[in-house]
Amino acid sequence: MKFFALFIYRPVATILLSVAITLCGILGFRMLPVAPLPQVDFPVIMVSASLPGASPETMASSVATPLERSLGRIAGVSEMTSSSSLGSTRIILQFDFDRDINGAARDVQAAINAAQSLLPSGMPSRPTYRKANPSDAPIMILTLTSDTYSQGELYDFASTQLAPTISQIDGVGDVDVGGSSLPAVRVGLNPQALFNQGVSLDDVRTAVSNANVRKPQGALEDGTHRWQIQTNDELKTAAEYQPLIIHYNNGGAVRLGDVATVTDSVQDVRNAGMTNAKPAILLMIRKLPEANIIQTVDSIRAKLPELQETIPAAIDLQIAQDRSPTIRASLEEVEQTLIISVALVILVVFLFLRSGRATIIPAVSVPVSLIGTFAAMYLCGFSLNNLSLMALTIATGFVVDDAIVVLENIARHLEAGMKPLQAALQGTREVGFTVLSMSLSLVAVFLPLLLMGGLPGRLLREFAVTLSVAIGISLLVSLTLTPMMCGWMLKASKPREQKRLRGFGRMLVALQQGYGKSLKWVLNHTRLVGVVLLGTIALNIWLYISIPKTFFPEQDTGVLMGGIQADQSISFQAMRGKLQDFMKIIRDDPAVDNVTGFTGGSRVNSGMMFITLKPRDERSETAQQIIDRLRVKLAKEPGANLFLMAVQDIRVGGRQSNASYQYTLLSDDLAALREWEPKIRKKLATLPELADVNSDQQDNGAEMNLVYDRDTMARLGIDVQAANSLLNNAFGQRQISTIYQPMNQYKVVMEVDPRYTQDISALEKMFVINNEGKAIPLSYFAKWQPANAPLSVNHQGLSAASTISFNLPTGKSLSDASAAIDRAMTQLGVPSTVRGSFAGTAQVFQETMNSQVILIIAAIATVYIVLGILYESYVHPLTILSTLPSAGVGALLALELFNAPFSLIALIGIMLLIGIVKKNAIMMVDFALEAQRHGNLTPQEAIFQACLLRFRPIMMTTLAALFGALPLVLSGGDGSELRQPLGITIVGGLVMSQLLTLYTTPVVYLFFDRLRLRFSRKPKQTVTE
C-alpha cells in the first residue's frame, strides 16, 4: 500500500520519472541502427587458390586437399566445403556464431602458411582469403559501361581504383569484380608457321620471358654527380612485342609477329558481363558477417560522388542493384503497423470506458512503455529490424493490458462512488498482485528462448528481450503513472451518470448478462466441458503433426538471383549467347526493373544473374508468382537451365547453389558417389514437392584424353615434361611474363590462336622439338580420344561431396519436401557408403523441428514454476494453464485457413499466446481466491462472481491484444510475409481461447479445488484414527 501511495500522492516525481524514461527511449531510438533482421550471419571465410590450366581433379588433390587438412585443424570451424574447377579452388569455412571473424582470419592465414610447402610450385600466387560469404547475395551491384573504353580497360579501372577504395569502407567484406579480366598482351600462336620455322612453343615462351625483364641496374657516380642507370629492358605493349626476335632459321631472324598474332587484349577472354542488354563490368559488393547492411550501403552511397569525380567522362557508373530500399520500405510498413496498433488499442479502451479522461491514461502509458524500450534495445546492442519492431507492435496489446486492469478496477470503485485518490489507492492495491503475476508469467514464457542456441536462438533473442523489456517498463508504469493519473484526472461518477448506458455500453451489459446465464448452465454440466477440453488437447497434437512446416517465411525482397547451368560440353561463345537469351526473356517481363549477369571464368557452363523487381506498389505479383511465370518461359530455352530464387535475409551455409535449399551426399568412395548421385537426382526431380532440382556434380564434361607412348617418346628423345609443357603452352592461357605498371601488374598470355583450335585437328598440328633439334609432331608419340571428365570436384570436410539443390513449388512446404526426400532415399536403397543429409537452411530447419516441441514444453514449465511460486500452490497454475489448448487449436486452424505453413515466426506467435491467454485465467483465479478468503463464498459462488466481475477487463485485454495484432494480419506491402504469420497465429489463438476459456477455466478451477480438498482431508482422517 505504501509503495502505491508513494507515487499516487507525489504526482510531480511520478511524471518526471516517466519523462526520464521517455527521454532515454528517444535518445536510444535516434542511435539505434536499422537492419532487416537481427544479426544472425555465421562468420564465413573464403580461401581462394589458382593454378592456371590445372584440371579440377588436379586442383582437388594437389591444392584443395593440403589446404583442407591444414584449415580443418582451426578451432570453431563448424563446416568446411570446397569446390575445385579448371585452374581454381575455393574453400569455404563456416565458423561457430561466437567465433570472432578477425581471430578466425588470423588462424586461416596461419593455416595457409603451414600448408604452403605442400602446394604445387607452379602456382602464380599464394592462396588468399576473404572475410565474406560468396553464397550471400550482394548488398549492392555497381556497373561500369562505356562506348569508348574496352572491357579490359573498364575492368582494370574497376579493380585497380574502385574496388580497393570501396573495400576500405566500414562494413564491406568483399568487392568481386566480374565481366572481364585485367588487360594483357596476348600472344596467339600459329602452329603451322611455328612448324615451318622450326620454332617450338617453349622457344617462344623463353624468348618473350627473357625479353621482358625488370631488374635493378644500379647507378654511376663521380665526385660531384650520381646517375641512375635505366634501360629499355621492359616491353609494355603488343606493338613492342611484335618485332621481338625469337629464333634464327638458316641465318634469318624469326620475329614473334611472323609466327603469332600479338594483341593488346585481356588476361582471360572467357569472361562476359552484361547489364540489361549492354556489356558491362560488375562490382558485386558483399558485407562483412557482422556488418549492418543499411549503414554499409549508406556509407557506399556517400562515397560514390567522390568516386564519380575520379571516373573519366566516357565511363558511366551506375547502381544496378541496392538491397536497402526494400528493407527501408519493410521497416516503414512495420512502423505504420505499430502506430495503427496503438490507435486501435486506445480505441478499445475508449469503447469500454466511454470516457475521454480515462482514455488519455493508456494513451500516455502505452507510448511511455514502448518508447522507453528503445533505450534498453540500444544498451543491448540491438537494431531496429522487422522482428524487434514486430515485438513492439505485439507489445502494444500487452502493455495496455496492465494499464487496463488497473484503470478498469479504479473506474469500478469510482462508479461505486469512491473518491478518486482513494479509488486509485484501493483499486491498485487489489490488482497489484494480479498485474505482477500477469507480467512475470508473460516474461517467463521467453526465458527458454533466451537460452536457445544456434541460429533460431540468435534470431529470436532480440524479439524476446525487446518484448520482455516493454512488459517490464509497462509493469512499472501501470503501478506508478497509471494510478497517479487516475487519482488526479478521473472524477467520481454521479448516481444518474451510472445508469446512463448507451450504444456499446448497453451491448456490453447485455453480453455480460448473457455470459452469466450461459456460465450457470456450464457449471451444471462440467463433464461436457471436460470432454471439450480433452478434445482440444487431442486436436492440438493432430494439427501440429499434420500442418505443413517451414523454417522461415519465404520473403519477397524485390531481388531475385539466377543460376545458369548449361550443357557440360558447351563452349564459352555459346554460353555467352545463352546468357543474352535468358536476360532478354527476363528483361521483357513487366515486373522486372533491372537485370545484370555474367558468365565465364573457371566454369564456362555456368553463369549468374541478379534481377531487381519493381517496387511492390508497382507490381501486383509476389516474387514467387513472378518466378513461376518466368519458369515457364525459361524452360523453352534449349541446352541450358536458369534457376531463379528470391533473395532472402537469412541464408545459411557457404555453398553457392542454384536454389534455396540443399541436400548433400557424402562418400569416401568417389566412384560410388558418382554412380548414385544421378540416380538420386533424377528420382528427386520427379517429386511434386520439389522444383528446380539440380546438382553441383558435373562429371560429364567433354575431355580429350591423350595417351603417351613412352617407349616411342624415349626413342625420339622426348620426355613427359616437354610434352605436358607443349599442351600447357598451347591451350592453357599460360602467363609467361609480367608487365609492371605504376598502378598494377599485367600479364603476357600465350596460347594457340583460337582460329586454329576450332576442332580436334588442332592437336595434329602440335609438335615438340626433341633433343636433336627435330620437330616431332604430337601424333607420333600420343593417341587421343574423347572422354568424359568432371568440370568440378567438391568436398565437405575431407570427404567427396555432391550437393543437390532444390526450390519449393507454390503450395508446398519445406516439411513436405524433407519428408518426400527421406521417402525417396529409402525407396532407392542407397548403400551405406553414400550418406545423405540436409545442408544450409534445410539443415537448420531439421534441427529447429526437433527442438520446437521441447521449447514449447519448456515455456509452459517455466510459466508453471513462476505461477506456482507466486500463488504458493501446485494446483492454481494448472487452472491457469488450462487456457492454452484452445489457443493452440485456434492458432493452428488459422494458419491452415490462410494456407500459411508453421514457421519460426508462427512459433513466436504460439509462445506469445502462452503468455496472453493465461491472463484471463489469472484475473478469474485471483478474484475467486480473494472472494473465498474474505467473502466467505463457496468455490462455485466465488468463481462465478469472479467471472462476472472480471468480464469487462477480460474482454478489454483480449480485444486490445487482438486489435494490436490485427494490423499484422491485414498489412500488405514490403515485409508482409514476415508479419502476417505472427498476426494470424495470435488472432486465431485469441479468438478461439476467448470463446472457450470463459467457460473452461471456471470448470477446471472447481475440478482442482475439489481435488485439493479430497487430498487435504485424507491425512487428517489418518491422524484421527
UniProtKB/Swiss-Prot annotation:
The keyword Membrane applies. The keyword Nucleotide-binding does not apply. It is found in: Cell inner membrane. The chain crosses the membrane at residues 3-23, 333-353, 360-380, 387-407, 431-451, 463-483, 528-548, 853-873, 875-895, 897-917, 953-973, 984-1004. It is a multi-pass membrane protein. Keywords: Cell inner membrane, Cell membrane, Membrane, Transmembrane, Transmembrane helix, Transport. GO terms for molecular function: xenobiotic transmembrane transporter activity. Its main location: membrane. Induction: The mdtABC operon is transcriptionally activated by BaeR. One of its GO terms (cellular component) is plasma membrane. The MdtABC tripartite complex confers resistance against novobiocin and deoxycholate. Part of a tripartite efflux system composed of MdtA, MdtB and MdtC. MdtC forms a heteromultimer with MdtB. Belongs to the resistance-nodulation-cell division (RND) (TC 2.A.6) family. MdtC subfamily. This is Multidrug resistance protein MdtC. It comes from Escherichia coli (strain ATCC 8739 / DSM 1576 / NBRC 3972 / NCIMB 8545 / WDCM 00012 / Crooks).
